Every structure is written in C-alpha cells, then in structure tokens.
Design a protein with these regions (language model features):
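Charged, glycine-rich active-site and insertion segments that engage polyanionic ligands
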Residues: 2-73, 77-102, 178-181, 187-303, ...
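Conserved alpha-helical scaffold flanking the Walker A/P-loop in AAA+ ATPase domains
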Residues: 39-44, 128-152, 160, 167-171
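A short hydrophobic beta-strand->loop->alpha-helix junction that borders the nucleotide-binding pocket
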Residues: 56-57, 113-118
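Conserved beta-strand scaffold positions in the cores of enzyme catalytic domains, especially
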Residues: 111-113, 202
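Flexible beta-alpha connector loops of hexameric P-loop NTPases
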Residues: 121-131, 158, 202-203
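Loop/turn-to-beta-strand initiation segments
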Residues: 147-152, 177-183
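Conserved Walker B catalytic segment
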Residues: 157-179, 188
C-alpha cells in the first residue's frame, strides 16, 4: 500500500463515508453535476488541466463522488490524446475496468487520500486532519506513477485541516510535482486558507434539484430504494437537495421530529414548555436527533434574519441567539452536556428575542 492510500483492507472505518451510503469511491453514478463534470473533462482533453481544483458546494451534492469519478477516469485513461478520451461524453468508467476495480477496493496505486484518521485508542476519528496525514500522503509524489499518468491526492474535506496541516498541503500545492493533481473538497470554499484557495481553480457544484436528489437516493440501493418516493422527496427538500442531508432526515423518526420542531418554532414568542419537554425526551442522548433539532432551529433563525429588512438594530437579538445556538450546540456535543438544558435555554432565548421584534 502506498502512502496516504485508503484503509479498505484494514477493517478501520472511513471518516469520509456517509452513514447509510456507499463510500464515494464505490459510487458509479453522479446526478445533477453534468456541467462540473464537463469542465474537468474538457480541461483534461485540452491538455490544460490545472494541478489543483477546489470542488466547492454544499455538503451532500456529489463533490467527493466527482473527485473519485475523475480520479477513476484518469487512472483508466492516463493519456488525454487517446480516441477513448476524445470520444468520452462524461467521466464514467465501466465497472469491470481494472481502474474501477482498484478504486472500489480502496487501493488505487496512484491515489492518496487525505481525511481525518481513526484513533484506535479512543475508538473515534480525530477531530482534524493532522500534519502527519499530509506528510504520509506526500510520499505518493516521491514515487513514479505506476500507470505513467497523474498522481492524485483527494482531500475530503478542507474544513478538517488545521493550520499546520493546511500549511503543509500548501507547500505541496505551491510547488507541485510533475503530473500531480490535487482535488480538494470544500463545503465552504470561502473558509479555506486564502493562500491555498488562491492556488486552486474553483469549481462550484450546483445544488441538486428535487428530482436529481431523489434519483441519487434511490440509486443508493437498499434500504433507500424501498422508501416511498414521497418520503424521499420530503427529506430531499428539507435538506435543500443534499443527498447526505436527506439520509440524515430519513433515519428513524427524524422527519417527524423536524416537523414537530418547526411547529414549536412557529408559535414563538409563545412556548409550549410541556411539548418542548416531550420533544427533548424524544431526542434523549441521540446525537443525530439532536443535530436535526438544532438544524431546525438554525434554519428558522436564518429565515427570520433574511426577513429582517436589513435593519441591524432589529436583527441584533436574533443574530445573538444564532451565534449562541451554534456555539452552545457544539459545546453540548463536545463536552457531553445535557441536551435538554440546551433546548430549554435556547427556546427561552428565542422567546425573548422574538418578543423584542
């Protein structure tokens, strides 16, 4: 195994795998991103492929799938001048091709993967991509390509870099080895280290339409292929076209939880404390349910802030609650604080802020 390669054969989990879905390297189809796919293909065919790409867009729209799809295509077609590349309409590679098999198995020789590593001592993923991971991945560029084509580094995602690992990656991108390619997944491109961002070509992926999101969910196979289309459409709409977000809502009774939270928020500044107590009991210690509830609160605040008419004084109470909710939610999870206390405190703040409007 080369430096930085995936751990497919080691039995360790992958931090870049969405729960309930195949890993992006195992995904053979891409929905709703024909424009982005064509831009990569055209650049490669024209012999002007930039050495670093920042694949931006909201989470769950196919950025990592596109990165692996492009890597698979380059491994299968290391020469851009071949008739196969000239005739290609997209970046698809037949499932039986050796490059496709190697990628699906997690052991493509010319690909390094940068992601949060698994801490076997704690049984959890590290919270950041550490500089050691970047150094290991850089070993790929100290060796010759096995197929004579590109050596590719896939980073998923840029938000997980800390300052040291970001600077270590920047050094590689600033002085790229010959025929090297960096595919950097970023959910919030504006937050990427400016010097790193400036050396990448930005490729923004489009939000998925409702139809594309439902098609992508169905293509995941069981159990999602058996879910009623109406439920898939509702989850996709609630997640704003994010496939990963839709999967989040499809777990357990989370759509119902989201609807109940929206009903409580719609009654503000009045608060039904009894119903909130029952809602908090339903969440319990489940972190995913807690994320649904905090997501509903933040989305509601975002919508209200957008309706504020631009008056900073009028928006100030809601903006303060927005910041407090984001900070307190992170602390509640990180420090394993009482989730019910967080919810009661948050709704008290929301009630006070909305009374001031």
């Amino acid at each position: 195994m080369r430096p930085g390669e995936g751990r497919a054969g080691e039995g360790l989990p992958d931090s870049d795998r969405q729960e309930g879905a195949p890993h992006p390297r195992e995904t053979g189809v891409l929905f709703g991103q024909a424009r982005a796919e064509a831009e990569l293909l055209d650049s490669y065919r024209a012999g002007r492929l930039h050495h670093a790409w920042l694949l931006g867009g909201r989470q769950g729209t196919g950025k990592a799938t596109l990165a692996w799809r492009f890597a698979r295509f380059l491994l299968a077609h290391p020469d851009p001048g071949t008739p196969e590349v000239r005739a290609a309409r997209d970046l698809s590679v037949p499932a039986g091709h050796p490059a496709a098999s190697a990628v699906a198995a997690g052991a493509p020789g010319d690909v390094a993967v940068l992601r949060r590593a698994f801490n076997e001592k704690s049984g959890k993923f590290f919270s950041e991509i550490r500089v050691d991971e970047v150094r290991r991945a850089s070993g790929l560029f100290q060796q010759a390509s096995r197929a004579g084509g590109y050596r590719i580094c896939i980073l998923d995602s840029a938000e997980d870099l800390n300052r040291n690992s970001a600077n270590a990656l920047l050094k590689l991108v600033e002085e790229p080895p010959q025929r090297s390619l960096f595919l950097v997944v970023a959910h919030h491109p504006a937050q990427v280290l400016p010097t790193l961002r400036s050396r990448c070509r930005l490729l923004l992926l489009d939000p998925l339409s409702g139809g594309d999101a439902v098609a992508a969910l169905t293509a995941l196979g069981p159990p999602w292929a058996g879910v009623a289309p109406e439920a898939l459409a509702e989850a996709a709409a609630r997640a704003g076209g994010s496939v990963g977000g839709a999967l989040h809502y499809l777990g357990g009774e989370r759509l119902a939880l989201d609807r109940d939270a929206a009903r409580l928020l719609g009654r503000l500044p009045a608060v039904d404390w009894g119903e909130l107590h029952r809602l908090a009991d339903r969440v319990g210690a489940d972190e995913d349910d807690f994320a649904v509830l905090t997501g509903a609160i933040l989305d509601w605040l975002h919508a209200r802030l957008g309706q504020g008419g631009g008056d900073p004084r009028r928006l100030a109470p809601l903006a303060e609650v927005w910041e407090k909710v984001r900070r307190s939610a992170r602390e509640t999870l990180a420090l394993n604080l009482d989730k019910k206390t967080f919810l009661f405190s948050t709704f008290a703040d929301l009630s006070q802020a909305t009374r001031a409007l």
